[in-house]
Amino acid sequence: MAKEKFERTKPHVNVGTIGHVDHGKTTLTAAITTVLSKTYGGSAQAFDQIDNAPEEKARGITISTSHVEYDTPTRHYAHVDCPGHADYVKNMITGAAQMDGGILVVAATDGPMPQTREHILLGRQVGIPYIIVFMNKCDMVDDEELLELVEMEVRELLNEYEFPGDDLPVIQGSALKALEGDAEWEKKIIELGEALDSYIPEPERAIDKPFILPIEDVFSISGRGTVVTGRVEQGIIKVGEEVEIVGIKDTTKTTCTGVEMFRKLLDEGRAGENVGVLLRGTKRDEVERGQVLAKPGSITPHVNFEAEVYVLSKDEGGRHTPFFKGYRPQFYFRTTDVTGAVELPEGVEMVMPGDNLKFKVELIAPIAMEEGLRFAIREGGRTVGAGVVSKILD
């Protein structure tokens, strides 16, 4: 069968394997690429290619991540797999690998383990919207009742963290047997591919979301007015549309009277483009870096939120010492730093470099935010942590 050329016409979906150490996440990743490439075209990735994950930097944090891709008849998948537990924590919190869905791998021989729970909780906190379960190593369990018991346990655990545990797909398989070419177990990988296709909805593209442009710079052009520049985060801005300026100060409304890119005038600016937006009747000192330009009513400013946070270790260039109650670092959202006071959870006295935890923050100025927004924690310009807004509290 001839290899198909890469079709950009297929919808693109981001997924990843999550779950306890040694439950077979990387073996499953290899099995998916091997079986699906044999069935639908594409290229297989061997276990050691995936396991030897390259390091990458996200928000100043080094993370080891393997990226593979594969196709089903209707979709193209980009899939991330991390070698170590700490890499998962960092990956999920920084959003280095934004997942439209997660494949939770649970060994039938062990059932749910501490990291199984931790990854489900993290998935809930950082906003992984859909989870599919692959029960691995089922070839090593002869007792049908035991398999049912493990499946029930996993479903209950997912319910506990507000995933629809009773309804989501659970596939019982063996990644190793599938990788070795055993036809009975290969079928289970095909089944997993079908579950990805049917259970994870097509993600909304950045361009279809409401317009947001984080402001990086402000200029005044004599005779024309004020121009703000930045990279359009999502959506489209058209000349003549009303926009809101949100964050830091009170929200104000204005109209976009021009869009330019590389000194050329355009009718619109789109997600991913670096543009200048001319604002009608807005004075130079009424806008500043750190605010966002947004579709009216689509995003609101907040000061109080709960966050899931990873604190950099000393080796990663983070703090050398723990921090305590009353910690007041800067929180870097999109384009600017805002000081905030940290409220540690009950019973937590201090936080060590390398920890991950949930805490509350009160900023000294409001920032345009929604749940799922990523930020860095900084001290005097140096990154000491990364976080994601898991819940807005005001």
UniProtKB/Swiss-Prot annotation:
Domain of life of the organism encoding this protein:
Bacteria
* Keyword Hydrolase recorded: yes
Q: What does this protein do?
A: GTP hydrolase that promotes the GTP-dependent binding of aminoacyl-tRNA to the A-site of ribosomes during protein biosynthesis.
Q: How does it assemble?
A: Monomer.
Q: Give positions of region: G3.
A: 81-84
Residues annotated as binding Mg(2+)? 26
Instruction: Note down the stretches annotated as region G2.
Output: 60-64
Q: Which UniProt keywords apply?
A: Cytoplasm, Elongation factor, GTP-binding, Hydrolase, Magnesium, Metal-binding, Nucleotide-binding, Protein biosynthesis
| Keyword hit for S-adenosyl-L-methionine | no
Entry-linked SUPFAM superfamilies: EF-Tu/eEF-1alpha/eIF2-gamma C-terminal domain, P-loop containing nucleoside triphosphate hydrolases, Translation proteins
- Identify its protein family: Belongs to the TRAFAC class translation factor GTPase superfamily. Classic translation factor GTPase family. EF-Tu/EF-1A subfamily.
Question: Region labeled G4 — which residues?
Answer: 136-139
Organism field: Alteromonas mediterranea (strain DSM 17117 / CIP 110805 / LMG 28347 / Deep ecotype)
Domain (tr-type G): give its ranges. 10-204
For the ligand (GTP), the binding residues are 19-26, 81-85, 136-139
Give the catalysed reaction(s), semicolon-separated. Answer: GTP + H2O = GDP + phosphate + H(+)
The name of this protein is Elongation factor Tu
Location(s), subcellular: Cytoplasm
Q: Where is this region: G5?
A: 174-176
